[in-house]
Amino acid sequence: MKPYLELLQHVLEYGAEKSDRTGTGTRSVFGWQMRFDLNAGFPLVTTKKLHLRSIIHELLWFLQGDTNIAYLKDNQVRIWDEWADANGDLGPVYGKQWRRWTGPDGVEIDQMQWLVDEIKRNPDSRRLVISAWNVGELPQMALMPCHSLFQFYVVDGKLSCQLYQRSGDIFLGVPFNIASYALLTHMVAQATGLGVGDFVHTLGDAHLYSNHFEQAREQLTRTPRPLPTLRLNPDVTDLFAFRFEDIAIDGYDPHPAIKAPVAV
């Protein structure tokens, strides 16, 4: 996870001090890219322990088109609790846009199903793009999409993914985002009969909150450990049929977790 640690170090040393929506204050840089070879191990941060259950269940929740936190709460995942209303609803966030994007004519579009079909039909397409940034529905969202657009690319029978993330909470959010989109790439590859290539992570405003500086410095004192490996149930070939038990991470031996407050 050298690219991630380099980002952490760079922002601590050279980031610009900025105010932000939450009132916490940040140190940030604009425009940063990381690349992870998905054949060299699963890109899961080892310099602190991540909550795998949250990463996996959140992605499955997105893929089902769900926007209510009931499923997450039922599976002991609390990462969206602060933004949900009294009924557990978040408005038309990621799952809605991925699976039921509403066009100007009111017709809903299943972007993810289209993506799987198009990769099979035309793997050389330059239009293998999914967007969660539906301008007409942004005001209704509890939180506007941070990881807003991603694109797939096929060459030599391998599927790569590039994510554009407009806003990245480097200490808490970005490690989750790396793992989530790496997992998604593996799942889409299996559903389309492909191997995996790279995950490319492009960040717009990459920031550390001011109350995460000490935690980031502590993390940088730790020596990275070998990356784990991802194991998917080979019998699942429908992207939307994956369940939690179909996904396993082997050999994850991280340093202890480092607690940090969430900026809401």
From Swiss-Prot:
(6R)-5,10-methylene-5,6,7,8-tetrahydrofolate binds at residues 51, 169, 263. Pathway: Pyrimidine metabolism; dTTP biosynthesis. The keyword Methyltransferase applies. The keyword Transferase applies. CDD domains: TS_Pyrimidine_HMase. DUMP binds at residues 21, 126-127, 166-169, 177, 207-209. It is found in: Cytoplasm. One of its GO terms (molecular function) is thymidylate synthase activity. The active site is at 146 (nucleophile). Its EC number is 2.1.1.45. It comes from the Bacteria. It holds the Pfam family Thymidylat_synt. PROSITE patterns: THYMIDYLATE_SYNTHASE. GO terms for cellular component: cytosol. Keywords: Cytoplasm, Methyltransferase, Nucleotide biosynthesis, Transferase. InterPro entries: Thymidate_synth/dCMP_Mease (IPR045097), Thymidate_synth/dCMP_Mease_dom (IPR023451), Thymidate_synth/dCMP_Mease_sf (IPR036926), Thymidylate_synthase (IPR000398), Thymidylate_synthase_AS (IPR020940). GO terms for biological process: dTMP biosynthetic process; dTTP biosynthetic process; methylation. It catalyses: dUMP + (6R)-5,10-methylene-5,6,7,8-tetrahydrofolate = 7,8-dihydrofolate + dTMP. HAMAP family: Thymidy_synth_bact. Catalyzes the reductive methylation of 2'-deoxyuridine-5'-monophosphate (dUMP) to 2'-deoxythymidine-5'-monophosphate (dTMP) while utilizing 5,10-methylenetetrahydrofolate (mTHF) as the methyl donor and reductant in the reaction, yielding dihydrofolate (DHF) as a by-product. This enzymatic reaction provides an intracellular de novo source of dTMP, an essential precursor for DNA biosynthesis. Homodimer. This is Thymidylate synthase. It comes from Xanthomonas campestris pv. campestris (strain ATCC 33913 / DSM 3586 / NCPPB 528 / LMG 568 / P 25). The lineage of its organism: Bacteria, Pseudomonadati, Pseudomonadota, Gammaproteobacteria, Lysobacterales. The gene is thyA.
